[in-house]
C-alpha cells in the first residue's frame, strides 16, 4: 500500500455550505461536480443539498466521480442512542446506495458550531457520565455502519465536546477500535491546539478518513482576539485550501504514506464562494498536491 491507495477528493463546502445554506445557493450540483472534474479530483462528500441516490448516482457516473462519505450530526448525549440509531441507519442506507466508504460522525450535543458565540473560548465540555454515554453510543453506531459496509469515522471539530487532542485521546481510549475510527482534520487540529501532528502520530492506526484543511494564521489570530464564532471565522477567511495557508502538508502526507494509509484525503475549506471562487481554489489545491506532495522529486 502507499500513494497509489490514496484517493483525492474535495468537499462541496467550497461551493455551498450546510452551516449557512444561503452561501453559494446558486451553485448547482451539476456545476459543483463538473468543477471537481476540471480540477482533477476523484470524488467528493455528500452535501445537504444533494439529491436522492438514483439522481446523484447518474450525475456521478456521467463524470466518473465517487462519493467518499457524508456528515452525520449525532446527539447521543442529548437524545439517547435509540433515536440516533434509527436516524443513523437511514443515513447508512443512503451512503450504501451511493457507494460511499465512510460515515462521518460529529457529536453535536452542546455544540457552539452553529451559534454566534466565541468558538475559541466557549466550547462545551462533557462530564464523565456523558463521555461514557457517548463512547457506548458510538460503538453501537459503528456496528450499524459495519452492517452497511461502512467505517464510522469520528470528526474532531471546533466548537464541540471533542475538539482538542486530549479529547480525541479520551474518545479513542473509550471506544472499540473495531467499530469507531477517526477522521483526522489538519485545520481543526491546528486551530484548536496550534499543532496538527500530535493527533496524527498518536492515532494513526485509528484513522480511516482525512481532511486536508489549511488555515490563514493572521486571520485566525484576529478571530481569536475578537472572539468570533465559527461561522464568522470562516466567512472572514480563517480556512483555505492546502498551499494557501500556514500548514505544512508535506510532513502530514509523508506520515500517512509511511504508515500505509489507504483511503480518501479530502480537501476541505469553508469559504464564501462569492469571495473565494470555488474552482479557482480547487485548482490551487490540486497544483499544490501535484507539485509538493506527489512530485517524485520531493
Swiss-Prot record:
Keyword 4Fe-4S annotated: no
InterPro entries: IolE, IolE/MocC, IolE/XylAMocC-like, Xyl_isomerase-like_sf, Xyl_isomerase-like_TIM-brl
E.C. designation(s): 4.2.1.44
GO molecular function, one term: manganese ion binding
Annotated metabolic or biological route of this protein: Polyol metabolism; myo-inositol degradation into acetyl-CoA; acetyl-CoA from myo-inositol: step 2/7
Cited SUPFAM superfamilies: Xylose isomerase-like (SSF51658)
Residue stretches in coiled coil: none
Keywords of this entry: Cobalt, Lyase, Manganese
GO process annotations (BP): inositol catabolic process
Cofactor(s) demanded: glutathione; Co(2+); Mn(2+)
Main EC class the enzyme belongs to: lyase
Catalysed reactions listed for this entry: scyllo-inosose = 3D-3,5/4-trihydroxycyclohexane-1,2-dione + H2O
Entry's family note: Belongs to the IolE/MocC family.
HAMAP family attached to this UniProt entry: IolE (MF_01672)
Name of the protein in question: Inosose dehydratase
Organism: Bacillus velezensis (strain DSM 23117 / BGSC 10A6 / LMG 26770 / FZB42)
Gene this protein is translated from: iolE
Amino acid at each position: 500500500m502507499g500513494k497509489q491507495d490514496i484517493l483525492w477528493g474535495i468537499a462541496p463546502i467550497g461551493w455551498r455550505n450546510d452551516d449557512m445554506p444561503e452561501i453559494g445557493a446558486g451553485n448547482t450540483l451539476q456545476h459543483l461536480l463538473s468543477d471537481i472534474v476540471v480540477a482533477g479530483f476523484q470524488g467528493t462528500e455528500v452535501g445537504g443539498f444533494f439529491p436522492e441516490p438514483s439522481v446523484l448516482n447518474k450525475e456521478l457516473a456521467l463524470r466518473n466521480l465517487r462519493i467518499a462519505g457524508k456528515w452525520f450530526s449525532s446527539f447521543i448525549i442529548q437524545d439517547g442512542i435509540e433515536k440516533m440509531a434509527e436516524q443513523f441507519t437511514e443515513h447508512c442506507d443512503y451512503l450504501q446506495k451511493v457507494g460511499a466508504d465512510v460515515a462521518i460522525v460529529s457529536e453535536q450535543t452542546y455544540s457552539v458550531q452553529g451559534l454566534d458565540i466565541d468558538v475559541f473560548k466557549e466550547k462545551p465540555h462533557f462530564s464523565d457520565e456523558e463521555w461514557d454515554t457517548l463512547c457506548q453510543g458510538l460503538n453501537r453506531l459503528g456496528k450499524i455502519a459495519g452492517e452497511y459496509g461502512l467505517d464510522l469515522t469520528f470528526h474532531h471539530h471546533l466548537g464541540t465536546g471533542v475538539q482538542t487532542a486530549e479529547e480525541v485521546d479520551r474518545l479513542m481510549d473509550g471506544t472499540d477500535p473495531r467499530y469507531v475510527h477517526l477522521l483526522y482534520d489538519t485545520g481543526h487540529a491546528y486551530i484548536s491546539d496550534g499543532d496538527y501532528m500530535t493527533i496524527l502520530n498518536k492515532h494513526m492506526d485509528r484513522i480511516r478518513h482525512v481532511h486536508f484543511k489549511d488555515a490563514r494564521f493572521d486571520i485566525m489570530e484576529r478571530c481569536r482576539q475578537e472572539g468570533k464564532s465559527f461561522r464568522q471565522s470562516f466567512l472572514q477567511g480563517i480556512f483555505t485550501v492546502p498551499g494557501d495557508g500556514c500548514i505544512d502538508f508535506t510532513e502530514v502526507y509523508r506520515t500517512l504514506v509511511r504508515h500505509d494509509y489507504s483511503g480518501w484525503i479530502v480537501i476541505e475549506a469553508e469559504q464564501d464562494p462569492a469571495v473565494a471562487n470555488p474552482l479557482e481554489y480547487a485548482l490551487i489545491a490540486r497544483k499544490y498536491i501535484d507539485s509538493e506532495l506527489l512530485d517524485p522529486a520531493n
